[in-house]
Regions:
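Extracytoplasmic gate region of multi-pass secondary transporters
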Residues: 27, 210-267
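A late C-terminal transmembrane helix in Major Facilitator Superfamily
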Residues: 331-365
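Conserved MFS/SLC helix-loop-helix module at the cytosolic interface between two early adjacent transmembrane helices
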Residues: 57-93
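Helix-breaking motifs and short loop linkers at transmembrane-helix boundaries and internal kinks
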Residues: 38, 70, 91-97, 125, ...
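C-terminal transmembrane helical hairpin of 12-TM major facilitator-type secondary transporters
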Residues: 274-324
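Cytoplasmic helix-loop-helix junction between adjacent transmembrane helices
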Residues: 101-138
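Interfacial helix-cap and linker-helix signal at transmembrane-aqueous boundaries
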Residues: 33-34, 65-66, 150-156, 241-242, ...
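Helix-loop-helix hairpin linking two adjacent transmembrane segments in secondary transporters
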Residues: 136-179
């Protein structure tokens, strides 16, 4: 790898790691927040939803900025914003303040994804992008493991507020990003070409033709399902484990680490299948696998079987996360790549984020089996949509889209 490639993958992996650490802080703090503020499960679920709404807003703004002013500047801005909002949670002692800060954190985190994926796509060969986006996504899982370890120590001794102080660490990353990363020649050429031919960078480019509109909306449905499954499971699985097995926060953190390891292994396998065979093959295997393995948790009644169930669920449900950035980056032109990645993924985050609220209601009104049936059905819907998208059938032989489809 070249020096810039090394810094690209290191910076994006670190950025996703710190972003995921912030998201998982909420997962582990959710039960203590409910207890300390005396709120319902539905109100607590809305905390995660506010984060995802912020991601939609931030993704829209920073996606456009990433295509207009450059990936590097935009990437550093997004990291700084979510770091500030996360650290400020230390001073939050009421639900409205928590909602506001999580929305602000979402703005920064939402902007980061598309810019990071664009950086990877523009600095590596097409045949490497699936694996490289998976490596960056694995960085996110490292952040989740660090969050689990931190939560197991900090929450019992210092309370949930103190956990969020670690959120200021990403500020350090912005220095290294601005100092060591440089824009790719592919981006600079595409930007110059767009300016020369007076092509505007706007959301309407994603809906320029009927086929492109169908592709964009279909990918949005898939990301909605991905985020609904991930946030729904990650925000509530620790609580489910604590309730079903009577585990403490510390022990449930160990269980979560096993789940996250499963996710990381899934990302490695997914990236390999995608680059070796095709995006369609990789997504087909993992979407069907996700729909099936969710029910394993119903039969898990010991610590060991819960760990194995968690690893399998993590392997399939989040193994494909990095694949979305790789697919979107190859289906849309370089000059709107950041916009496409951020808008599509963050529409998924905004709508899929409501799964935290919906699952809270399902858990309160029904049982775990109904909740798993709901999530399993979503994965099957995503599988059907993926089969209908013509872009997936062509993806193996089309390195990068240079023009919008007719």
């Amino acid at each position: 790898m070249t020096r810039n490639q090394k810094w690209t993958i290191a910076s994006t992996a670190a950025g996703f790691s710190l972003e995921n650490m912030d998201i998982m802080f909420l997962s582990f703090a959710l039960t203590p927040i409910i207890a300390s503020l005396h709120i319902s499960q539905g109100a607590a679920g809305l905390i995660g939803t506010m984060t995802n709404l912020g991601m939609l807003f931030g993704g829209a703004i920073f996606g456009l900025l990433g295509d207009k002013i450059g990936r590097i500047k935009t990437f550093s801005y997004t990291i700084f914003i979510f770091a500030f909002a996360t650290g400020a949670m230390f001073f939050a002692h009421s639900l409205p303040v928590i909602y506001a800060l999580r929305f602000l954190a979402g703005i920064g985190a939402g902007g980061e994804y598309g810019v990071g994926m664009a950086l990877i796509a523009e600095n590596f060969e097409t045949k490497q992008v699936g694996r490289m986006t998976s490596v960056a996504a694995i960085g996110g899982q490292v952040g989740a493991i660090l969050a689990a370890l931190a939560a197991s120590f900090i929450i019992p001794h210092f309370g949930w507020n103190a956990l969020f102080l670690l959120g200021i660490v990403p500020v350090i990353l912005t220095y290294f990003v601005r100092r060591h990363l440089t824009e790719s020649q592919e981006f600079l050429t595409a930007k110059e070409d767009a300016q020369k031919n007076h092509r505007k960078i706007s959301f309407t480019r994603l809906f320029a033709t009927p086929r492109l509109t169908f592709q964009t909306l279909g990918l949005m449905v898939m990301t909605i399902v991905q985020i609904a499954g991930y946030f729904g499971l990650m925000n509530w699985l620790p609580s489910i484990v604590q309730k079903q097995q009577g585990l403490s926060v510390s022990k449930s953190s160990i269980w979560m680490i096993a789940t996250i390891i499963g996710m990381s292994l899934g990302m490695v396998v997914f990236g390999y299948i995608m680059d070796k065979f095709s995006a369609k093959a990789a997504f087909s295997i993992f979407l069907i696998g996700s729909a099936c393995v969710l029910f394993i948790i119903l039969a898990a009644h010991t610590a060991l079987t819960m760990i194995l169930a968690g690893m399998l669920i993590g392997f399939f449900s989040n193994g494909m996360f990095g694949g979305y950035g790789a697919v979107i980056s190859r289906l849309y032109p370089t000059e709107i790549r950041s916009t496409a990645n951020n808008l599509i993924m963050n529409v998924g985050r905004a709508i899929g984020g409501f799964s935290s609220f919906i699952i809270g209601i399902l858990m309160q009104s029904f049982n775990l089996k109904v909740t798993m049936m709901f999530l399993s059905g979503l994965y099957l819907v995503s599988f059907i949509v993926m089969q209908l998208l013509p872009g997936f059938r062509q993806l193996k032989n089309v390195p990068t889209a240079k023009v919008e489809p007719e």
